[in-house]
Amino acid sequence: MKINVIRGTHQFGGNAVKVTSDSGSAIVLDFGAEFAVNGGRAIVAEGITAGKPGVLGVLISHSHKDHAGLIHTILPRVPVYMDRIAGRIYRTYSEVTGRPEAAAAGKMKALPPLCGKIEFGDITVTPFLSDHGTYRSEMFLAEADGKRLLYTGDFRLHGLLRSELLSGLGSLRGTVDLLITEATCAGRGDEYSTYVPSERTLEKSVLEFLGKSPVILFCSIINIDRIAGLSGLVRDRGGRVFVSWAEKRVIDEAAADDAPPAAFYSNLSIPETYDSSLFSDVRAGDLIFTSSFEDFRILSGMIPSAELVFTEWPGNLAHMNSAFREDPRFHVMHVSGHAHPAELREFAEFLLPRAVLPVHTSSPEKCAELLEGFRVLPLQDGEDFTL
């Protein structure tokens, strides 16, 4: 089995990993858009975006654009796969946000259910549950030529699905030849885990605010687990939950079939537009979700009694003026979707792979230090490695 990281050995986002069996069967794991800070470059790859089709499929681990955002550039005859519900959510998200990959997202094929198998030539792939703050994030086990690799996509161990993630992978312990793991936080030090709260910490803090005030909470439109969890807690306490029409469209996709039960959303009030009369009776215990910086600002002025909770990466605060950020009601509670340094070590010790290949990182050398005792591969983008 041959591994080639098309992009991702020395940068965040824009992941793409090619896996080829000895007989020539090939697949690609993720095909993400590069962040603007890295240049926003497309991927030009023979057999994937150019020339004749040379891979049997592209598998997307989760619905973030840095892992799925270039699917519209893939050759039409190369099928793209994603979890069934996650794919529908990504299609809807792409439509409501005007993403260029919206049409391609609507044509994706569904992967089998968790722990089901799908074959691409002589490569067998099994999806496993992950936790990244997007509904149905997945890890992929690829098997060929008597070898096994596990590709994590993005993951964390401080989310709501920690126990389910680890228990699902328990049978793989000690059997994985290569762990291809995200290492976003590898260079940030152990102190990182002390100032990034868990999802449970966030829920506790929001409930404390709701005990005395309404709360306006900024989070990603596709963070269904967070929206569902907080909505359920608010509902149980007799509060109301407000979302915009865009969030409602995504929620409708998540509430279908075997996704989170619709009861989570039974008390939602859905404003088409924000106006002062809609929020005239907002009271303590009510929760307003938004994923729009402009709406966050407008709502904060319309509801002066509300606490303002920002749960995304603090670097995104550059979109807001300093006066807004200095409002005493404003609280940054970023719950990372990425494994803390200690969690990267914990995960490797749990899985016991024979070798580790860090991706989605600007600090692969830090990952090698963090995973002392494990064989960590220092690959470059475009470099082949044979298991």
Report the location of each language-model feature.
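Short, aromatic/basic amphipathic alpha-helical patches
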Residues: T92-P100, G232-V234, E253-P261, H319-D327, ...
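Short, polar loop motifs at secondary-structure junctions
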Residues: H64-D66, I85-G87, P113, A246-K248, ...
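His/Asp/Glu-rich metal-coordinating catalytic cores
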Residues: K2-L59, K65-K212, I216-D225, G229, ...
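C-terminal regulatory/interaction regions
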Residues: Q11, D236, N267-L387
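Hard-cation-handling environments
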Residues: E191-R297, G301-M302, V309, V359
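Short internal beta-strands
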Residues: V78-R88, I180, R240-R249, L308-E312, ...
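Short, charged/polar "capping" segments at the starts of alpha-helices
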Residues: V37, A86-R91, D225, K248-E253, ...
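Short connector loops at secondary-structure junctions
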Residues: G32-A33, E182-D190, S244-A256, H334-H340
